[in-house]
Swiss-Prot record:
Keywords: Isomerase, Magnesium, Metal-binding, Phosphoprotein. NCBIfam families: glmM, PRK10887.1. This is Phosphoglucosamine mutase. It comes from the Bacteria. InterPro entries: A-D-PHexomutase_a/b/a-I (IPR005844), A-D-PHexomutase_a/b/a-I/II/III (IPR016055), A-D-PHexomutase_a/b/a-II (IPR005845), A-D-PHexomutase_a/b/a-III (IPR005846), A-D-PHexomutase_C (IPR005843), A-D-PHexomutase_C_sf (IPR036900), A-D-PHexomutase_CS (IPR016066), Alpha-D-phosphohexomutase_SF (IPR005841). The modification Phosphoserine is found at residue 101. One of its GO terms (molecular function) is phosphoglucosamine mutase activity. It comes from Pseudomonas fluorescens (strain Pf0-1). Its EC number is 5.4.2.10. Binds 1 Mg(2+) ion per subunit.
Length: 445
């Protein structure tokens, strides 16, 4: 059964446009509360990023949840993975995050976590959707839920992040720049790295509700690259608005993407005999990652794009490490979902163990040229179903004769078609990608 509201990563859209409206959030809170209450006594944690609309939606969700008899614990601005962690430690039935991740401030959305800190099962999302289409009824007055605020949430999460590296670990002597994207990591990330001994220069940690992800963070790396050079730092770390993506910059100012971070973490675990199985990437993972892992004898499989699919594959195989080139990195040996701060700490530990800088360590992975072009399209039939697009994709794949890949897919969160071509010759790859992107644009007109 297809879902009406839930996408690949919860519910997301433009603020003020259905369903990202206060009245829908009120009803969503009620529907979620009713669904969670079927599991017994109901306690729900609610956190958010720094978007100005978060206050509005927090109040609406709070009203809806309590009207269904659920108790609500408000966490305030916190990284998405912190809500997953705290949902477990508070033994809540669920955690809710108000965020649109790496999107600009005029988007917002809702993500749900189970009480185990994992994404909600499909059947529970479907139950919530069914309840959304029924009349809203308030529980009797004596059963209305209570609301409390958790004032030490940041401190709890900071200590959890620090616990992901061995006791006594010190990054003293390491000079780093971190870009918090004016988002949910703005308080906790500087504290984590400073308390572990690093010298920290902080960028984009003055959220005003409107500047989240605005020319900063993991989707706009220029500011961090410049700062690493001007500050003579050892490396830079960029988070996205809700703290579940991380990218890095080495001391030369070069960007280190999620594929490279995943390789560094996996190789470190492998060398210490703690990898447990293989590595999960996605259809967008660079071919070079697969080849480099193969050289180490590490199995590699590709999941669909989206961290929930990476997580599902990890769970099915009982493996520990997976991620996306966009910077979602999952370390199941420490947490239940993609966590940018914890992933960054694992990279720093790997560098410390090898006594290498990031620029040196990343050389072990030689990436194949990969060109990604995003093509925006309107409503109607997907351009991917057009015969001309299918024929061109097959022709390009055949022309690369097994030494490259073509991937055309719709975004799960935006009206975009992603055109990706990968191979050994960069000019050839770019030519093929531009040819396919032009064709997708033409058939979308």
């Amino acid at each position: 059964m297809s879902k009406k509201y839930f996408g690949t990563d919860g519910i997301r859209g433009r603020v003020g446009e259905y369903p990202i409206t206060p009245d829908f959030m009120l009803k969503l809170g009620w529907a979620a509360g009713m669904a969670f209450r079927k599991m017994g006594a109901c306690k729900v944690l609610v956190g958010k990023d720094t978007r100005i609309s978060g206050y509005m939606f927090e109040s609406a969700l709070e009203a809806g949840l309590t009207s269904a008899g659920a108790d609500v614990m408000l966490l305030g601005p916190m990284p998405t993975p912190a809500i997953a962690y705290l949902s477990r430690t508070f033994q809540a039935e669920a955690g809710i995050v108000i965020s649109a991740s790496h999107n600009p401030h005029d988007d917002n959305g809702i993500k749900f976590f189970s009480g185990k800190g994992t994404k909600l099962p499909d059947e529970l999302e479907l139950m919530i959707e069914e309840l959304l289409d029924t009349p809203m009824t308030v529980v009797e007055s004596s059963k209305i839920g209570k609301v409390s605020r958790i004032n030490d949430a940041s401190g709890r999460y900071i200590e959890f992040c620090k616990s992901s590296v061995p006791t006594g670990t010190s990054f003293s002597g390491l000079r780093i720049v971190i870009d918090c994207a004016h988002g949910a990591t703005y308080k906790v990330a500087p504290s984590v790295f400073r308390e572990l001994g690093a010298e920290v220069v902080v960028l984009s940690a003055q959220p005003n509700g409107l500047n989240i992800n605005d020319n900063c963070g993991s989707t706009h790396m220029g500011q961090l690259q410049a700062a690493v050079l001007s500050e003579h730092a050892d490396l830079g770390i960029a988070f996205d608005g809700d703290g579940d993506r991380v990218l890095m910059v080495d001391h030369t100012g070069a960007i280190v993407d999620g594929d490279e971070l995943l390789y560094i973490i996996a190789r470190d675990l492998h060398e210490r005999g703690k990898l447990q199985g293989g590595v999960v990437g996605t259809l967008m993972s660079n071919l070079g990652l697969e080849l480099a892992l193969a050289d180490l004898g590490i199995p590699f499989v590709r999941a669909n794009v989206g961290d929930r699919y990476v997580i599902a594959e990890l769970l099915e195989r009982n493996w520990l490490v997976g991620g996306e080139n966009s910077g979602h990195v999952v370390c199941f040996n420490h947490t239940t979902t993609g966590d940018a701060i914890i992933a960054a700490l694992q990279v720093l530990m790997a560098l410390k163990t090898r006594n290498e800088g990031l620029a040196q360590t990343r050389q072990a992975l030689r990436k194949c040229p990969q060109v990604l072009i995003n093509v925006r399209f309107g409503g109607g039939e997907s351009p991917l179903e057009h015969p001309a697009v299918k024929e061109a994709s097959a022709r390009v794949t055949q022309a690369m004769a097994g030494r490259g890949r073509v991937l055309l897919r719709k975004s799960g969160t935006e009206p975009l078609v992603r055109v990706m071509v990968e191979g050994e010759d960069e000019s050839q790859v770019r030519g093929y990608a531009e040819e396919l992107a032009k064709l997708v644009t033409e058939v979308s007109a």
